[in-house]
Amino acid sequence: MIKEKDTPKNEVIIETENLNLFYTDFKALNKINMKILKNSITALIGPSGCGKSTFLRTLNRMNDLVEGIKIEGNVIYEGKNIYSNNFDILELRRKIGMVFQTPNPFLMSIYDNISYGPKIHGTKDKKKLDEIVEQSLKKSALWNEVKDKLHTNALSLSGGQQQRLCIARTLAIEPNVILMDEPTSALDPISTGKIEELIINLKESYTIIIVTHNMQQAGRISDRTAFFLNGCIEEESSTDELFFNPKNTKTEEYISGKFG
């Protein structure tokens, strides 16, 4: 059972200012101004190709890996522009973690999947690593299912378990924000329900931004929702307001299924 959503804090953790993104000559994002509240779940919805996943990847500079990208404007995280020349990108990606659409566990044991990140960031003590692995798996609601087989290959897990493992792997490096790009689209309804419940529980300690094509999912788990269309935010407000009292005609048409 998914517990009732709590009201998020009013503290802004990420803010974008006139954010534009170009793929060579194509403008994929157009003047995105948005505030993300701390300890909130923000859903990004919209039709395929609207820019929501592109926007998500600007928040921890994953788009830097794509050739031909040009970005204008600011992304302010905890008071600093992440696109400034002296910003530590590795530290950024530790603080703003990412969970992808398809579960992507490393080809190694469950234990090594979780301990890999902390080791990279300097944790070598075995007792400390054991503690991180256990706590990360508990936070991702996977510990009881895998505690007796930590040294088996992670690929032996089911799809839903693999996705929770990927979430645990992200938690192990102590992020503040977790970006999720359609994390349940490849999962069955039971596994999807477990991930949704997990996301709501994680909000107590983390800020979550999730891209989803599933509007029912956005309604179930998110505090705020932004509707993207043609690289712009058409409307952004509390989830209840956007779904039940949309101000924009295009928003109403999209959520009523007139296009998608």
From Swiss-Prot:
GO molecular function: ATP binding; ATP hydrolysis activity; ATPase-coupled phosphate ion transmembrane transporter activity
InterPro entries (alphabetical): AAA+_ATPase, ABC_transporter-like_ATP-bd, ABC_transporter-like_CS, P-loop_NTPase, PstB-like
Protein location: Cell inner membrane
Known catalytic reactions: phosphate(out) + ATP + H2O = ADP + 2 phosphate(in) + H(+)
Its membrane topology: Peripheral membrane protein
Domain ABC transporter as annotated: residue spans: 14-255
Domain of life: Bacteria
Keywords tagged on the record: ATP-binding, Cell inner membrane, Cell membrane, Membrane, Nucleotide-binding, Phosphate transport, Translocase, Transport
GO biological process, one term: phosphate ion transmembrane transport
GO cellular component: plasma membrane
SMART domains according to UniProt: AAA (SM00382)
Documented EC number(s): 7.3.2.1
Residues that, per the record, bind ATP: G46, P47, S48, G49, C50, G51, K52, S53
Xref: CDD domains: ABC_PstB_phosphate_transporter (cd03260)
Oligomeric form and interacting partners: The complex is composed of two ATP-binding proteins (PstB), two transmembrane proteins (PstC and PstA) and a solute-binding protein (PstS).
Entry similarity comment: Belongs to the ABC transporter superfamily. Phosphate importer (TC 3.A.1.7) family.
Annotated function: Part of the ABC transporter complex PstSACB involved in phosphate import. Responsible for energy coupling to the transport system.
Protein name: Phosphate import ATP-binding protein PstB
Record organism: Borreliella burgdorferi (strain ATCC 35210 / DSM 4680 / CIP 102532 / B31)
